[in-house]
Amino acid sequence: MSKSLIHPSDLRAGLADIEMADETVDLVYKNLSEGQAHLQGEPFDIKDLPEGVSKLQISDNVRSDTSPNEYSDEDDEEGEDEYEEVYDPVSAFQDFLDETGSYLISKLKKGEKIKKTWSEVSRVIYSYVMSNFPPRPPKPTTKDIAVQADLKKPNEIQKISEHKSKSEPSPREPVVEMHKHATLENPEDDEGALESEIAHQVAESYSKKYKFPSKSSGIFLWNFEQLKMNLDDIVQVARGVPGISQIVERGGKLPLRCMLGYVGLETSKRFRSLVNQDKLCKLMQEDLNAYSVSSNN
């Protein structure tokens, strides 16, 4: 029997994982639909509005110094805004799932096991969902609202203490302690967000080929798939590229060709045998400079 055949137990396990993934996609779609109910013309609860909306006032006063030309320009701008394409996160997520499914099928056709491939794909889907659809905080219950209302009722003792606190400077030691506590917790969240964003952008271009200078004074094509590494390992090595964390913090696109060259030099003997390292270092520096400038803008 050929070693390339897939065991039936692996197929059953893979089908079960795919069914679970479908249920997860349906759940995410349902949550998105409920979250966008107000865009579909469905009524929504007034409690969901931000605080301070009730304080807004609509003024009927029109500036007398406004010329008719200004009104026409404003109308034209409003008309152009109406024809602008609205970003739909559901369709973007569906496109991402289609690309991920194509990648999964291509890996299975090459003879890779479903367990290994699905674990990698599931991490990519999880990072995409966490980066694009962060969980919403739970709504306060009526009991919490009642407790907050009771706490806000001032009595005479509180009024006296507030009056004294206004006349005397308040100590800032608790604020410093809270700030220190927050700075101790932020690094773990930042590390997770950094790895998720790198994994997301690498997964989107996993099979895309990039041009690299070869030792024979020409070029050759290479992609992340040819590294034959897990996505987690690629992310860990790519984090060593200088300036990557700053680009992610500014929400810019990552220099994927530079990252691919860096990971290839660190892990792939075949890549090192093909590439002209002097030209590659210059190319990587140019990519870093260009993407750093674009992320600042």
From Swiss-Prot:
Motif Nuclear export signal: positions: 49-58
Phosphoserine, modified sites: S64, S207, S268
Biased composition (Acidic residues): 71-83
One function term, GO molecular function aspect: RNA-directed RNA polymerase activity
SUPFAM superfamilies: Phosphoprotein M1, C-terminal domain
Compositionally biased spans, kind Polar residues: 57-69
Modification after translation (UniProt): Phosphorylated by host PKC and by an unknown kinase.
Region spans: Disordered: 57-83, 153-176
Key words of the record: Chaperone, Host cytoplasm, Host-virus interaction, Inhibition of host innate immune response by virus, Inhibition of host interferon signaling pathway by virus, Inhibition of host STAT1 by virus, Inhibition of host STAT2 by virus, Interferon antiviral system evasion, Phosphoprotein, Viral immunoevasion, Viral RNA replication, Virion
GO biological process: symbiont-mediated suppression of host innate immune response; symbiont-mediated suppression of host JAK-STAT cascade via inhibition of STAT1 activity; symbiont-mediated suppression of host JAK-STAT cascade via inhibition of STAT2 activity; symbiont-mediated suppression of host type I interferon-mediated signaling pathway; viral transcription
A Gene Ontology term for the protein's cellular component: host cell cytoplasm
Pfam family, one: PP_M1
Positions occupied by motif Nuclear localization signal: 208-211
InterPro entries the UniProt entry points to: PP_M1-like, PP_M1_C, RABV_P-like_C
Protein's job: Non catalytic polymerase cofactor and regulatory protein that plays a role in viral transcription and replication. Stabilizes the RNA polymerase L to the N-RNA template and binds the soluble protein N, preventing it from encapsidating non-genomic RNA. Also inhibits host IFN-alpha and IFN-beta signaling by binding and retaining phosphorylated STAT1 in the cytoplasm or by inhibiting the DNA binding of STAT1 in the nucleus.
Sequence similarity: Belongs to the lyssavirus protein P family.
Assembly and oligomerization: Homotrimer when phosphorylated. This trimer is stabilized by binding to the L protein. Binds soluble protein N, and ribonucleocapsid. Interacts with host STAT1, STAT2 and PML.
Protein name from the UniProt record: Phosphoprotein
Organism, scientific name: West Caucasian bat virus (WCBV)
Designated gene of the protein: P
